[in-house]
Amino acid sequence: MASVTGDEAVGIGLAVSHLASLGHRHIAYVGGDAEASTGLGRYQAFVARLQHQGLPLDPDLVAHADRFHEEPGAAAFAELLDRGTPFTAVVAANDRLALGCYDVLHERGLRVPEDVSVTGYNDMLFADRFDPALTTVRIPHYQVGVRAAQLLLEALADGESPPMTVRLAPSLVVRASTAPPRPA
């Protein structure tokens, strides 16, 4: 059976590269369930992009929530902050996890992006309503649907559906949640 999805590696790569281009060198990661394919894929993409950018991967700057939701994201991010390892930006594996990061930063008197830049993933309908509006990776949902329908129609016409995965390139929507880090 064929599947169509956004390219996780490209999407996370866009977020990390954007932060690196702003001057961030210590970037944290908050992921969802690392056992899920999405969680594992996005984390592996994060590690690979850090290496590609020549940036350090510090295990103290990685936290995984048990679900891709705001509350578990907040708990994972709070634990990460409590470790005391300095960082200037965080890549959240989806927008709901990013919202959890916002909650914790606000509770601790830290500001986005003045103290910590934040990126999300998915460009959910409310991402532009975050305060400040969230920089996030946009999955080409419409194009995913069109390509999936094309593959389905081809399979119905041919009577076959060869196993394949089609990955479509996402884009980065830059909003107000990212900025250069403050000078040390």
Regions found by a protein language model. Name each.
Residues 1-21, 82, 86:
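Alpha-helical recognition/docking segments in bacterial nutrient-uptake
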Residues 3-14, 30-76, 91-99, 121-124, ...:
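Hinge/beta->alpha junction and helix N-cap segments in small-molecule ligand-binding domains
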Residues 13-16, 24-25, 49, 104, ...:
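Solvent-exposed, well-ordered amphipathic alpha-helical segments
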Residues 18, 78, 83-184:
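Flexible loop/turn connectors
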Residues 24-27, 86-88:
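Short acidic/polar active-site loop segments enriched in Thr and Asp
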Residues 25-27, 57-62, 112-117:
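Short acidic capping loops at alpha-helix termini that bridge into adjacent secondary structure
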